[in-house]
Amino acid sequence: MHFSKLSLASLKIAAPLAVALAVSSCAFKHTKYENPITVQTQQPDKILYDKAIHDLEKGRYEIARITLNTLMNTYDSSEYMAKAKLAVADAWYREGGARGRAQAEADYKDFILFYPTMQEAAESQEKLCMIHYQQMDKPDRDPNEALRAEQECRQVLTQFPNSKFAPEAEQRLRDVQEILADAEMRVGDFYHQRGSFASAANRLGGAVDQYPLYSRADEALWLEGDSYTRLGPRFRQQAGDTYARLVRDYPLSDFADQAKSRLKTLEMPIPAPDPAAEARMRFEKENRTKPGMFHRLTGFIRQNPDTNVAAKSGTPQMNPPKQSIPVTVPVPGSQAGFQGDVTVTPVADPSALENKPDARQQPQAAKPKP
């Protein structure tokens, strides 16, 4: 009887305990797991990233790059991997200098290669454009940086046409092409003044064909037409076509009336002005920034070119320049037949080439006595 009372008492104590354990077990299974790293603290990769950005904003570029490289080497699967890679390029870009620009260019290109679909890829391409845009020289200097800027700005528009950087890159491309066109214009004008009219027509025509938004395209056409006129009647058609293009595509030009007079002299029709071209020229004249007196006086000491006169509207040239053929070079045979007295006589007996002795092995004939 004593044993039965003890067992009954034990069961009364054990039953509630078992129920409590079962309930607590179920509650533990459905309780949300708390990551101890995210409770009142930050992820270590984020700590490194925030520290690097703080150093970057304070101008401590070398320290920022060391921290960012530590992040990328330690946490290669971090969500901040792409941002860290871009921040390294930005650190080089802000540091500047020849070394900084070269390193930034390489890092931006790597970022676009590894993350082409990210929004920051368009920003990286825009920075590539700016690296060379800021290093452009004047039109009479080395055009290498301007050509590189043209290439990188084009890439923004072709690879990221819908990005927020596209409108700004388009205007920069117009600025760059203004400088490149002005360089060609200066060379063509030099040839024209020296009387080398064939070279002048080639240079001036190529400048307008490649950069129709050039602020002095009308003057270039006028000099091109004048060069053809001075080359003689043989180039009458080319001169007339050039004057007609000036009247049609640049109707508000100061040279339009002179071009019409030349067309009358050549007895060629005067075309009607293009309404779209007229509207564009009117817009450019109203919105073109005119340099002040101080700007003109200090122009000779400035290293960077003046882009105030660059077009503010219109689609810039998106194709690379084509190699133009000077007007004095004969047209290839596929476009015009060759005229000459050269004749070809076929070999009647092909075996004669093998049977006859080699003339090079025969003794040289004696020279006649004087």
Locations of the language-model features?
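Acidic, polar-rich low-complexity tracts and alpha-helical solenoid repeat scaffolds
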Residues: 2-13, 22-370
